[in-house]
Amino acid sequence: MKFLLLVLAALGFLTQVIPASAGGSKCVSNTPGYCRTCCHWGETALFMCNASRKCCISYSFLPKPDLPQLIGNHWQSRRRNTQRKDKKQQTTVTS
């Protein structure tokens, strides 16, 4: 019984002394990421904190890329213009 009490006291003391490292430490002061050995779902590794830990940053904190215009819309607009030119040429030829 005394041994069980001693073990529980030791575990209670250790939980107060040892820091919880499940969340990881911050990468750099201005970076909204955490140093981890393996990134969670929805995160990507931006750079290495040290030899074995990556700086994992959530996708929501990353900038959104500027996407170019869709090629399909551009092609349709060119096609309409050529059809109009053909109609104009036919009307000028017949007049």
UniProtKB/Swiss-Prot annotation:
Disulfide bonds join C27-C55, C35-C49, C39-C56. Residues 74-95 are annotated as: Disordered. One of its GO terms (cellular component) is sperm head. It is found in: Secreted. Residues 1-22 form the signal peptide. It comes from the Eukaryota. Residues 76-87 have a biased composition (Basic residues). GO terms for biological process: defense response to Gram-negative bacterium; innate immune response; killing of cells of another organism. It holds the Pfam family Defensin_beta_2. Its main location: secreted. This is Beta-defensin 132. The lineage of its organism: Eukaryota, Metazoa, Chordata, Craniata, Vertebrata.
